[in-house]
């Protein structure tokens, strides 16, 4: 992607987890991201069928996958699984994948939902999609930082 197309690109972002995958949608032009949906991570077939449906509906130009790390930046158990998920997305759907350090995305997502008074089951249901939104917003913020230097 280059020029105007890169600036107006649509992105889907994923917060990969063993039980659930949070998904967010965003646009590079507006630099805004919103929580979209949570996919139950039941098995590979279900996971990629659900992702395929989202890709058909939203037609993103690129994908962003959160890469879980320990606070000191070292990989942990989920790092390799998230990396594999991103590689599979790229292989199956032919879209470019960018990884974003998601060290504090869940903490930030939880705080954001609390600020908006989202409670109980609704908060639990939305948390992974909100974490994906945080990941995508972080990606857009990093793009902005690079453009201003």
From Swiss-Prot:
Protein name per the record: Putative pre-16S rRNA nuclease
One Gene Ontology molecular-function label: nuclease activity
EC numbers for this chain: 3.1.-.-
Cellular localisation: Cytoplasm
Protein's GO biological process: rRNA 5'-end processing
SUPFAM superfamilies for this protein: Ribonuclease H-like (SSF53098)
Coiled coil recorded as keyword: no
NCBIfam families to which the protein is assigned, alphabetical: RNAse_H_YqgF (TIGR00250)
Main subcellular location: cytoplasm
UniProt keyword annotation of Plastid present: no
A GO cellular component annotation in the UniProt record: cytosol
UniProt KW keywords: Cytoplasm, Hydrolase, Nuclease, Ribosome biogenesis
Family of this protein: Belongs to the YqgF nuclease family.
Function recorded in the entry: Could be a nuclease involved in processing of the 5'-end of pre-16S rRNA.
Alphabetized PANTHER family for the sequence: POLYNUCLEOTIDYL TRANSFERASE, RIBONUCLEASE H-LIKE SUPERFAMILY PROTEIN
HAMAP family: Nuclease_YqgF (MF_00651)
């Amino acid at each position: 992607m280059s020029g105007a197309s890169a600036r107006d690109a649509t992105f889907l972002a994923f917060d990969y987890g063993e039980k659930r995958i949070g998904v967010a949608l965003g646009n590079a032009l507006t630099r805004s991201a919103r929580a979209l949906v949570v996919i139950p991570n039941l098995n590979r077939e279900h996971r990629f069928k659900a992702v395929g449906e989202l890709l058909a509906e939203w037609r993103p130009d690129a994908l962003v996958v959160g890469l879980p790390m320990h606070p000191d930046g070292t990989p942990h158990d989920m790092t390799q699984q998230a990396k594999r998920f991103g590689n599979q997305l790229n292989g199956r759907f032919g879209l470019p994948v960018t990884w974003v350090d998601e060290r504090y995305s869940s903490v930030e997502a939880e705080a954001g939902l609390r600020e908006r008074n989202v409670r109980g089951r609704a908060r639990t249901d939305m948390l992974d999609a909100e974490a994906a939104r945080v990941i995508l917003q972080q990606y857009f913020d990093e793009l902005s930082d690079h453009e201003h230097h």
